[in-house]
């Protein structure tokens, strides 16, 4: 089995004359939590959409689950889980109906549906509201439902685009506890976020700004390299320093 779940080289995406992602290169090891950090508008969502086969890159190369992101996008979409920052839920459907919908999208055999629905309702703790309209659920509950729908086909590679945006700190903590449980079961997680404190949950991170990678590695290594004499420094300090260098 190939040790890398994701690998990209000089990946670029242009929209007209605007370069959203500027020749980025990185790899993601199987079974790790990989953080893609940066401010809003840095190129995080564009990158994750290229990796998930949603948009076609302008140039470069890349593989996800050993499939080519240029020529095998459909195969990629079938083997990964993807949770967008807007949660991609049908608000006029119930949680039960949303789960059924995604079972069909991912071509899960019908004889497995009942077990999968039960499994998703258990891991999301949504049994008690499975017949309520999704639009009536609190944001944190919709977040859990969106994650459950992304996992309904039990993928080994999960992409999460700003998954904790708009939810309270307690919900964020519970969310990360669950993500760690997934990786303990062998799932690889690629997560984008603009919350620098969430890097503490990641095995490795890439920091991106204006479409370009400004640092990558273990969060502690990045901080120590930039602040060898400041043990109190954190990743927010590191990012500010990296931005000042660019200026």
Short names for language-model regions:
Residues 216-217:
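ABC ATPase "signature
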Residues 100, 104, 111-129:
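Conserved ABC ATPase "signature" region
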């Amino acid at each position: 089995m190939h040790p890398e779940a994701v690998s990209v080289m000089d990946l670029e995406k242009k929209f007209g004359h605007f370069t959203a992602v500027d020749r980025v290169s990185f790899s993601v090891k199987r079974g790790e939590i990989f953080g893609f950090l940066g401010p809003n508008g840095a190129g995080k969502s564009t990158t994750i959409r290229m990796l998930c086969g949603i948009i076609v890159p302008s140039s470069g190369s890349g593989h996800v689950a050993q499939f080519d992101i240029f020529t095998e996008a459909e195969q990629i979409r079938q083997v990964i889980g993807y949770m967008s920052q807007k949660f991609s839920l049908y608000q006029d459907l119930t949680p039960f109906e949303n789960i059924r919908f995604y079972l069909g999208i991912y071509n899960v055999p019908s004889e497995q549906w009942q077990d999968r629905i039960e499994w998703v309702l258990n891991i999301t703790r949504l049994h008690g509201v499975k017949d309520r309209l999704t639009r009536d659920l609190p944001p944190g509950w919709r977040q859990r439902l969106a994650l459950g729908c992304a996992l309904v086909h039990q993928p080994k590679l999960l992409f999460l685009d700003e998954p904790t945006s708009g939810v309270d700190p307690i919900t964020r903590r519970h969310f990360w506890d669950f993500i760690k449980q997934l990786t303990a079961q062998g799932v690889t997680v690629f997560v984008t976020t603009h919350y620098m404190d969430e890097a503490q949950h990641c095995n490795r991170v890439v920091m991106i700004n204006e479409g370009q990678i400004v640092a990558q590695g273990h969060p502690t290594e990045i901080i120590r390299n930039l602040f060898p004499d400041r043990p109190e420094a954190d990743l927010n300090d590191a990012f500010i320093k990296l931005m000042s260098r660019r200026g």
